[in-house]
From Swiss-Prot:
Membrane-topology annotation of the record: Multi-pass membrane protein
Residue spans, topological domain Cytoplasmic: 1-7, 86-100, 144-151, 221-244, 329-332
Protein name: Fe(3+) dicitrate transport system permease protein FecC
Protein induction: Induced 1.8-fold by hydroxyurea.
Gene Ontology CC entries for this record: ATP-binding cassette (ABC) transporter complex, substrate-binding subunit-containing; membrane; plasma membrane
Organism (species): Escherichia coli (strain K12)
MF terms in GO: iron chelate transmembrane transporter activity; transmembrane transporter activity
UniProt-listed GO biological process terms: intracellular iron ion homeostasis; iron import into cell; siderophore-dependent iron import into cell
Variant or mutagenesis effect after changing residue 60 to E: Retains 29% of wild-type citrate-mediated Fe(3+) transport
Periplasmic side: 29-64, 122, 173-199, 266-307
Stated family: Belongs to the binding-protein-dependent transport system permease family. FecCD subfamily.
Gene that produces this protein: fecC
Amino acid sequence: MTAIKHPVLLWGLPVAALIIIFWLSLFCYSAIPVSGADATRALLPGHTPTLPEALVQNLRLPRSLVAVLIGASLALAGTLLQTLTHNPMASPSLLGINSGAALAMALTSALSPTPIAGYSLSFIAACGGGVSWLLVMTAGGGFRHTHDRNKLILAGIALSAFCMGLTRITLLLAEDHAYGIFYWLAGGVSHARWQDVWQLLPVVVTAVPVVLLLANQLNLLNLSDSTAHTLGVNLTRLRLVINMLVLLLVGACVSVAGPVAFIGLLVPHLARFWAGFDQRNVLPVSMLLGATLMLLADVLARALAFPGDLPAGAVLALIGSPCFVWLVRRRG
């Protein structure tokens, strides 16, 4: 199938899907009955909210906004990594960034005498992901111009397993924090509040314009490193900027929702299938699709455990695992 060319279909369908699922997420599967009309009125200013409307404003709306921001950020990070490494299997989860950030968060939660929140957590997660990413790139030869793509993925999988092993040891040694860390490791937005929105929003608002401004250079990088260099792209600076943006995005997401997997791996392929290979289209479409997938996973997580709740990461794993196997077989 060729990429969608008509702008109404290219942009209209993903935007419409996101809006519809966002609206449904505000009132579906609620322990306290909430109607679609309640959800709509909750978004309108100038009146005293009823109990269902207050529930939407204080719980459901920040939860859905956090899901949108995290889905868009992880999809964008995955697209950038696949472009940067010329590897269709690259993602924050497979290259060890998620697990490194999660290990840093788990160690901080277990060892810190006082709770840490806000941008400090994002910074800690970004540092953990950055150290893990450097180790993967070094072990997998990712800093060489002619690196083995499979070697890079294998290094990422090995380091991810190592980090997750250390995280489990942390759980065993820090029994007082074990349940909270365990639930957080599953990846989800069930505990998201407005402070999480304000924690994520500046990172996303800062990163997205920079990435979109680099879209033309990323198009050249898609051809080959040598072609991009010949056409005037400063590869060292571009790689540094992209790596920093990826670490900021992933660190912020992991600090709020835990290590959510598969969005960064699958969504870039869906975006290229839908929008072609022009990064000016692929980058924003991947953000729309990532936000929609994360929201959908959160709604399904509520549906499967209603009136309880499941982490959205568990649903994404159920969806992503067979898709990952299909992707591996398709790539031969």
